[in-house]
């Protein structure tokens, strides 16, 4: 049974911290293929890999994926998936889920959740969050934090610790980290990437701030399952390989 949404996986080879990470293997299967397999388990109408790299494209075609070759000039994965939407035959209201290419253990239920959330909100974008479990995570600038309204719409995203506990600097209660999984309406996605970057976005290096800056809302729900680690470094890959061995022995 397929659900009424599409998954597009932006797949960039030249990652700044770990070039070629999507072609690294976890128990004989590349990271990008594992992401693709997890996306299929969410039962979308389609799964497309968007890349500008020949080797990624060739490997994806070999394991049966639909591939769209995109420009090598894109600055973000969102720009890359928008090119796929612009080239395709998507309806304006089609739900497009952006699944990062470096999440080999992305939970299918989270993909379904973020897509379903978009169909139940007037916001043009939906995403997820998860409670922060330590002060170290809260203070890590590589972990994006989010604060929301009482009706689950984003007030702000930041690399800083938000909200700031003035009277207890060791507290991290009621703090949430953002999960970089998005669902967009196709028409809004194309509109979004046409806007120039805003000042806050450039300061924080967080493109979702462009949406809030422009006066649109982002629906944020707490994930139904705890998200697993993505792969940003060689150390993350080693942890992912060990995690696979651990779950294989359960």
Swiss-Prot record:
CDD domains: CMP-KDO-Synthetase
Gene Ontology CC: cytosol
Subcellular location: Cytoplasm
Pathway in which this enzyme or protein is active: Nucleotide-sugar biosynthesis; CMP-3-deoxy-D-manno-octulosonate biosynthesis; CMP-3-deoxy-D-manno-octulosonate from 3-deoxy-D-manno-octulosonate and CTP: step 1/1; Bacterial outer membrane biogenesis; lipopolysaccharide biosynthesis
Any GO BP: lipopolysaccharide biosynthetic process
EC number(s) reported in the record: 2.7.7.38
Keyword Transferase: yes
Keyword Cytoplasm recorded: yes
GO molecular function, one term: 3-deoxy-manno-octulosonate cytidylyltransferase activity
Enzymatic reactions: 3-deoxy-alpha-D-manno-oct-2-ulosonate + CTP = CMP-3-deoxy-beta-D-manno-octulosonate + diphosphate
Top-level lineage group: Bacteria
Keywords: Cytoplasm, Lipopolysaccharide biosynthesis, Nucleotidyltransferase, Transferase
Its job: Activates KDO (a required 8-carbon sugar) for incorporation into bacterial lipopolysaccharide in Gram-negative bacteria.
Family stated for the protein in its record: Belongs to the KdsB family.
Stated name of the protein: 3-deoxy-manno-octulosonate cytidylyltransferase
The gene coding this protein: kdsB
